[in-house]
Amino acid sequence: MTSPVNVDVKLGVNKFNVDEEHPHIVVKADADKQVLELLVKACPAGLYKKQDDGSVRFDYAGCLECGTCRILGLGSALEQWEYPRGTFGVEFRYG
């Protein structure tokens, strides 16, 4: 019998080169609240977090660049979604 997979452990081996000067994902100031709620549930890295006051906070550091939020939120919740500039972004390390 195999042991269950711990997603946090698997994500922990990835390396992230964060471009502090140029975020590759920008949330709209007037983002659709329902879409933000969907992104909280859909983001596999858990980067959209619901706060105690009901607002949603996002941090692009740690992004897996899967495109889930692009598909669900571009135009309604996201102002911009593009891949990080060269040498930046996620470096997958299978461990």
UniProtKB/Swiss-Prot annotation:
Highest rank taxon of the organism: Bacteria
GO molecular function, one term: 4 iron, 4 sulfur cluster binding
Entry keywords, A to Z: 4Fe-4S, Electron transport, Iron, Iron-sulfur, Metal-binding, Transport
Gene3D superfamilies: 3.30.70.20
Keyword Cell membrane attributed: no
Family classification: Belongs to the bacterial-type ferredoxin family. FixX subfamily.
Reported function: Could be part of an electron transfer system required for anaerobic carnitine reduction. Could be a 3Fe-4S cluster-containing protein.
Protein name: Ferredoxin-like protein FixX
